[in-house]
């Protein structure tokens, strides 16, 4: 048996937590905000006992270039340990991320004393290389929470895409 491993990254406010909850609802084990330093240990555990981790999603939050470099090294370690994984990147247009942060009345993690939009742009600069390497990019600009959950379910549920069956009598 092999493990199905997803590494989920993306812009703050693009829906990583919503994606994690959707995966949990469909039987995935989810680890949120795991430091890259622990990837090596996790890779060894998965390689040793893949049946213990049939479907594992690791949600990462890349907030600095050094974190990105650490994450990339950790992903290499996963691959070198024989663990196959896919990366999913969640994104949305800046104006939508801005609206989401304003609606939630929360500061952007990279904002500091600058404007909210500056924080979003700083994060985009840092995560762009990860987006370029992602296996799947999901644009959440036009999606609400339920739409994103449906999209994630269709992409990664065991049964494949969810379909509507209509029976007319």
Per-region residue spans from a language model:
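Short glycine-/polar-rich loops that comprise or flank the Walker A/P-loop
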Residues: 3, 26, 52-55, 81-86, ...
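Hydrophobic anchor at the beta1->P-loop junction of P-loop NTPases
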Residues: 8
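P-loop (Walker A) phosphate-binding loop of NTP-binding proteins
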Residues: 11-14
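A conserved segment at the C-terminal end of the G1
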Residues: 16-30
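Conserved nucleotide-sensing/catalytic segment adjacent to the nucleotide-binding pocket
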Residues: 26-76
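Conserved beta-strand segments of the P-loop GTPase G domain that flank and frequently precede/overlap
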Residues: 33, 58-61, 88-91, 138-139, ...
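A glycine- and Lys/Arg-enriched "phosphate-lid" helix/loop adjacent to the NTP-binding pocket
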Residues: 83-128, 136, 140-141
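C-terminal accessory "lid"/substrate-recognition subdomains
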Residues: 118-169
């Amino acid at each position: 048996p092999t493990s199905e491993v997803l590494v989920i990254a993306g812009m703050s406010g693009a829906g990583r937590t919503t994606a994690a909850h959707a995966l949990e609802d469909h039987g995935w084990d989810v680890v949120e905000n795991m430091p890259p330093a622990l990837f090596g240990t996790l890779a060894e555990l998965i390689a040793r006992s893949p049946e213990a981790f049939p479907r594992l999603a690791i949600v990462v939050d890349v907030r600095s270039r050094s974190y990105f470099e650490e994450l990339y090294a950790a992903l290499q370690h996963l691959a070198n340990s024989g663990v196959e994984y896919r990366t999913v990147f969640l994104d949305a247009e800046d104006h939508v991320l801005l609206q989401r942060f304003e609606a939630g009345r929360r500061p952007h993690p990279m904002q500091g004393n600058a404007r909210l939009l500056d924080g979003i742009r700083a994060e985009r600069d840092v995560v762009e290389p990860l987006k370029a390497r992602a296996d799947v990019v999901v644009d959440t600009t036009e999606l609400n929470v339920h739409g994103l959950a449906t999209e994630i379910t269709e992409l990664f549920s065991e049964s494949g895409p969810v379909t509507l069956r209509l029976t007319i009598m």
